Curated annotation (Swiss-Prot):
Induction: Down-regulated upon ischemia-reperfusion. The extracellular loop 3 (ECL3) is involved in binding porphyrins and transfer them to other carriers, probably albumin. Its EC number is 7.6.2.2. N-glycosylated in brain capillary, kidney and small intestine but not in heart. N-glycosylated. Glycosylation-deficient ABCG2 is normally expressed and functional. This is Broad substrate specificity ATP-binding cassette transporter ABCG2. GO terms for cellular component: apical plasma membrane; brush border membrane; external side of apical plasma membrane; membrane raft; mitochondrial membrane; plasma membrane. Highly expressed in brain capillary, kidney and small intestine. Lower expression in heart. Preferentially expressed (at protein level) on the luminal membrane of brain capillaries, in kidney and small intestine. Broad substrate specificity ATP-dependent transporter of the ATP-binding cassette (ABC) family that actively extrudes a wide variety of physiological compounds, dietary toxins and xenobiotics from cells. Involved in porphyrin homeostasis, mediating the export of protoporphyrin IX (PPIX) from both mitochondria to cytosol and cytosol to extracellular space, it also functions in the cellular export of heme. Also mediates the efflux of sphingosine-1-P from cells. Acts as a urate exporter functioning in both renal and extrarenal urate excretion. It catalyses: ATP + H2O + xenobioticSide 1 = ADP + phosphate + xenobioticSide 2; urate(in) + ATP + H2O = urate(out) + ADP + phosphate + H(+); indoxyl sulfate(in) + ATP + H2O = indoxyl sulfate(out) + ADP + phosphate + H(+); sphing-4-enine 1-phosphate(in) + ATP + H2O = sphing-4-enine 1-phosphate(out) + ADP + phosphate + H(+). It is a multi-pass membrane protein. The gene is Abcg2. The chain crosses the membrane at residues 396-416, 429-449, 478-498, 507-527, 536-556, 633-653. Residues 48-285 form the ABC transporter domain.
Length: 657
């Protein structure tokens, strides 16, 4: 759904002491009231492994002694690909792995507070909003988890409505954002929705990672105009950007140029051309300054070639060969350190209290939450249910397939008889049900993989705890997607097949299928948690279930397997379900009707099994009640183990880049 809203100039309203936009009685905040972010001697190194057989670890410097200050206004970080602009942005936002990081980031001269990641806003490059929800529902989710519970619902709704109006999202407020399967709002509206998610907490500092990526030039210009008006209300807006056009560049208040992790320029954006001219690089008429800066850094600009041509003869006479051969980046970095602009910045940074800078930052601690575990659990489960209903191709389709498959299997095995062929058919349908429950549970691998980026962003931003997210997703997935198919299978097949006609046996079969589905899904979660690619987790699951089928008890009699391999049967999920279903159905059944005891003994002696008990004994299944329930106990233990592994993998997942 496209909209002209991308190109509408939206006036930003004033803000009061409570930070509520559009409700001010005191007037707008001035620039002087905004937060000032300064960074001192920022150096960031990472360890890079190389080699195949012999792994060598080398240290790579991403940022090298970066100093600067970001004041209220538009602060742009510009540079070539791989220059370190996104790394610097993440460091300033306290979203970089603190290992390998040195230096200080201060807010108004003081270390970043422990809740800095929660109190500031961060808009990621790829908009991580729930596509199956509307714009308003996404904002409601952010408000419900990031605003204090003491704040009344009507106050939260008032803030949401104000932000929607501020961002020009009135016409699409109740439209779905859109997914890869369903069309939704436009790219510019999606970007503004992401910004609105962060404005819920009314942050004084807002970070954006390449906010114009994926947008056309007109929409990108509209987004930057919106950010410009927001900055005039006293916000410090810091963002990385790649090759902005001139209409966007002239909006910048401050410009930071990075290349190879070194600072090329940091100061007022409008002084950048004059600065480069003083370095000997003159921008051609009608050339975009942003493109010119990148061309100079990359050594591709005609200005660079012209400068070299004019000065080459003089340089050959006066400079040493080593200095003449220095890369442009090294020369520009050295020129900046000796420049007047750097001296002014350094003097301003030195005015900050030294004692405070040495305290260090606590911003890398765990997020500070303003809502309880139960409150977070309820909202996560609610959003997940809505997301499930918003993807009918995944939820409704699975239920329809379950009904159709159940009817087909019921027709194939319809009216099982109490004879030797009936025993074989019963074993066959039980084997199919347990293995089918396992393979259909492979879809659970998507539960954490698809939303990995969304989870990491929301967790770091202080939306919820890992435990709240984990159990909320379990409630929303295991109940409808694993419970209902098991109930449907049992209700359809039990009566079409003519299985044991007791209420107890009916519910035991249903419970067994549910336990198998839950165990297989838990295994899928344990394998997939922390993965980035669904196909890898799916492949591992499929291979695992194929091996489990071999030890389920139908394809080979488990008593005939050698002791060096027989222990693998205890790791087979289908085996426990298959054994429980057989015990539930065959115990006490007669399959040679009309035969007396003598003839029955003859049948047994000639290897014809006529009773369910004999069949169970032949399969090595204990006839006692414990022979049934120990399978469910084993499945329950496996569920606990797999879910614990999945939770720990989420808990210790690398959440910082």
């Amino acid at each position: 759904m496209s909209s002209s809203n991308d190109h509408v100039l939206v006036p930003m309203s004033q803000r009061n002491k409570n930070g509520l936009p559009g409700m001010s009685s005191r007037g707008a905040r001035t620039l002087a009231e905004g937060d000032v972010l300064s960074f001192h001697h920022i150096t960031y190194r990472v360890k890079v492994k190389s080699g195949f057989l012999v792994r060598k670890t080398a240290e790579k410097e991403i940022l090298s002694d970066i100093n600067g200050i970001m004041k209220p206004g538009l602060n742009a970080i510009l540079g070539p690909t791989g220059g370190g602009k996104s790394s610097l942005l993440d460091v300033l936002a306290a979203r970089k792995d603190p290992r390998g990081l040195s230096g200080d980031v201060l807010i108004n001269g003081a270390p970043q507070p422990a809740n800095f990641k929660c109190s500031s806003g961060y808009v990621v490059q790829d908009d991580v909003v729930m596509g199956t929800l509307t714009v308003r529902e996404n904002l409601q989710f952010s408000a419900a988890l990031r605003l204090p519970k003491a704040m009344k619902t009507h106050e939260k709704n008032e803030r949401i409505n104000t932000i929607i109006k501020e961002l020009g999202l009135d016409k699409v407020a109740d439209s779905k954002v859109g997914t890869q399967f369903t069309r939704g709002i436009s790219g510019g509206e999606r970007k503004r929705t992401s910004i609105g998610m962060e404005l819920i907490t009314d942050p004084s500092i807002l970070f954006l990672d390449e906010p114009t990526t994926g947008l056309d030039s007109s929409t990108a210009n509209a987004v930057l105009l919106l950010l410009k008006r927001m900055s005039k209300q006293g916000r410090t807006i810091i963002f990385s950007i790649h090759q902005p056009r001139y209409s966007i560049f002239k909006l910048f208040d401050s410009l930071t140029l990075l290349a190879s992790g070194k600072l090329m320029f940091h100061g007022p954006a409008q002084k950048a051309l004059e600065y480069f001219a003083s370095a000997g690089y003159h921008c051609e008429p009608y050339n975009n300054p942003a493109d010119f800066f990148l061309d100079v850094i990359n050594g591709d600009s005609s200005a660079v070639m012209l400068n070299r041509g004019e000065q080459d003869h003089e340089a050959n006479k006066t400079e040493e060969p080593s200095k003449r051969e220095k890369p442009i980046i090294e020369n520009l970095a050295e020129f900046y350190i000796n420049s007047t602009i750097y001296g002014e910045t350094k003097a301003e940074l030195d005015q900050l209290p030294v004692a405070q800078k040495k305290k260090g930052s606590s911003a890398f601690r765990e997020p500070v939450y303003v809502t309880s575990f139960c409150h977070q659990l309820r909202w996560i489960a609610r959003r997940s249910f809505k997301n499930l209903l918003g993807n009918p191709q995944a939820s409704v389709a699975q239920l329809i397939v379950t009904v159709i498959l159940g009817l087909i299997i019921g027709a194939l095995y319809f009216g099982l008889k109490n004879d030797p062929t009936g025993m074989q058919n019963r074993a066959g349908v039980f084997f199919f049900l347990t293995t089918n429950q396992c393979f259909t549970s492979v879809s659970a691998v998507e539960l954490f993989v698809v939303e990995k980026k969304l989870f990491i962003h929301e967790y770091i931003s202080g939306y919820y705890r890992v435990s709240s997210y984990f159990f909320g997703k379990l409630v929303s997935d295991l109940l409808p997607m694993r419970f209902l198919p098991s109930v449907i299978y049992t209700c359809i097949l039990y009566f079409m097949l003519g299985l044991k006609r007791t209420v107890e046996a009916f519910f035991i079969m249903m419970f067994t299928l549910i336990m198998v589905a839950y165990t297989a899904s838990s295994m899928a979660l344990a394998i997939a948690a922390g993965q980035s690619v669904v196909s890898v987790a799916t492949l591992l699951m499929t291979i695992s279930f194929v091996f489990m089928m071999l030890f389920s008890g139908l394809l080979v009699n488990l008593r005939t397997i050698g002791p060096w391999l027989s222990w693998l049967q205890y790791f087979s999920i289908p085996r426990y379900g298959f054994t429980a279903l057989q015990h539930n159905e065959f115990l006490g059944q007669e399959f040679c009707p009309g035969l007396n005891v003598t003839m029955n003994s003859t049948c047994v002696n000639s290897y014809t099994i006529c009773t369910g008990n004999d069949y169970l004994i032949n399969q090595g299944i204990d006839l006692s009640p414990w022979g049934l329930w120990r399978n469910h106990v084993a499945l329950a233990c496996m569920i606990i183990i797999f879910l614990t592994i999945a939770y720990l993998k989420l808990l210790f997942l690398k959440k910082y880049s």
